[in-house]
Amino acid sequence: MTPRPSAWRCAALALALAGCGSRAAPAGPNKHVASARSDAPGSIDPVLLARVQTTGPIGHVATASILAAPVDADVWSDLAERFDQAINAWDLADAAEVVAAMPAGSARDVKAGVLAFHRATYPEAEALLAGAVASGQLPPAGALREEAQHYLELARGAQRALGPATRLTSPDGQVEVVFSNAKDELIAPYLFAAMAEARQALGADLGIEPDHPVRFEILDDAVKLALVSPLTRENVYTTGTVGITKYRRIVMVSPRVMLYGYGWIDTAVHEYVHYLVTLKTRNRAPVWLQEGLAKLLETRWRSPDPLPLEPPARKLLAKALAADDLVTFAEMYPSLAMLPSQERAALAYAQVQTMLGVLREERGGAGIDELLRRVAAGEDAEAALATAWGDTFERFDAHWRDVMKKRAAGKPGGALRKLQFLAPEQQAAAEAGEDLSLLGDVFSHLGGGAARQHARLGVLLTLRGHLGPAARQYEKARAADARVRDDPKLARRLGELYLQLGKPARAVPLLRRAGEDDPEQPNLAAAEGRALRLVGDLAGARVALARALRVNPFIPALHCDLAQVATDPTEQQREQGLCRE
């Protein structure tokens, strides 16, 4: 997700919530300790620091009273406006030129601090902003002081969130990733490979590529998102927010700290779409347009065309269309992360994804390009979409509703998979590869008959390590009621047991059935991948293992199977090093 264009104090929040033809994951990333470089978080530009210490603080109000030397108020106002426009558009080179042209003083220090924050030199930003606030030269109230306080809190929050971070740079130099916890460096080669695919595909789709490395920050606690953005802890947990794009960087939560992981690679590409749209439109795209394109194109790294809505989202959209209970564009502002539930957020995504999907299907890439060009020129986004489609927005909206109602008619739905944050007491078990999904009443949906009784006994026996008897109980459950014989949850548990019992041929059809129902469950996908490998279906195994990897790469045994099916010697060596049975 990404901010709406406007002055900083009115900015919308930058927020968010598998292959085909993918390149081999590049090896040998360049590793740096973030504090070991003069341009890294943890370092302070000595020239700017000296300026703060000797000339006093730098920034913006249309008055010369807080500047070190007299300056024409109109000149200052023009400089401040140009700076705000540049920083909002992430044009840091232009913003730096403006700061250099500003006279010394506390107002300039504020703008220099904002620039340093966007450069991710957080200690430098803190020094500049804290100096400006403490100088006594800023007005006691007003936009400039609010701006200084806002970015000072963010600069301090970013340092607390990242701590003694480490940094890896992709072999092509196009991506840099900063990790708050070194354990999460495991994801780097997979992220670099996906981003190489995304850069090529999305560059063609959107007609733009960054001329600088794209910065990712990977956090080891979802709560830390509230330290580095205007989000609150409640926003994060209510809507399951795991990624944001703001201040010219992408910030994500590690899948390691989620109960069952999450689609972290799709999320990374989703956020990268925001990044590109922000650059292309100079940050003038509203939330609904940003989110629609990001959701539509988030799978382009692994698919030649955008993928259709998943059944749960399709069901949500069909129900909302029938009840005329859609999320309005106004409700989406300033961020989908501020909607009241994961269901409403998922519905909003489904709406805007399919709206932009209809435009792309019917007008092609040229339609998307015209829409973005018009928005970049300052045109209202709804009017721009209407022009790109070829009629009024009202007629487009009616057409889109009709199309989606027809597509959803008679199609199966499914339960929405909600993101769950890992509790501290679950961390050790998850890192050891334990499947926490067996906890609780797993088979309550089977009702109160014999099938459920046998299935529950199967769970208890599994937890006690009696795998053979557990499998027999699951078979009895399937035999007890024809309606549950094909139950995907039951199929999964039985398939996993047969795999552990050394019967992969019996496991494959059961795990495949379960995977059709829940393709994003990483433990299930990993089990299916192993079963397919053991029966000799290496191509099928690679597909299943890739599903697991893009949701939770921290399943220890997953890498053992990836090593066995790897065709590239470098990949094989890397995966073997990560293998933990």
Predicted segments, located by residue:
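Bacterial N-terminal signal peptides that target proteins for export
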Residues: 1-11
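Bacterial signal peptide processing site
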Residues: 20-23
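Beta/coil-rich, acidic/histidine-enriched accessory regions frequently appended to metallopeptidases
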Residues: 28-30, 36-101, 127-131, 343-346, ...
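Short solvent-exposed coil/turn linkers within tandem alpha-helical repeat scaffolds
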Residues: 69-70, 102-108, 134-151, 283, ...
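Solvent-exposed, acidic/flexible segments
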Residues: 72-76, 88, 92, 106, ...
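Sec-exported extracytoplasmic/periplasmic mature domains
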Residues: 88, 118, 130-138, 196, ...
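Terminal, low-structured helical/coil segments at or just beyond the last alpha-helical repeat
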Residues: 146-169, 173-175, 557-581
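Juxtacatalytic substrate-recognition/specificity segment
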Residues: 164-287, 297-306, 318, 323-326, ...
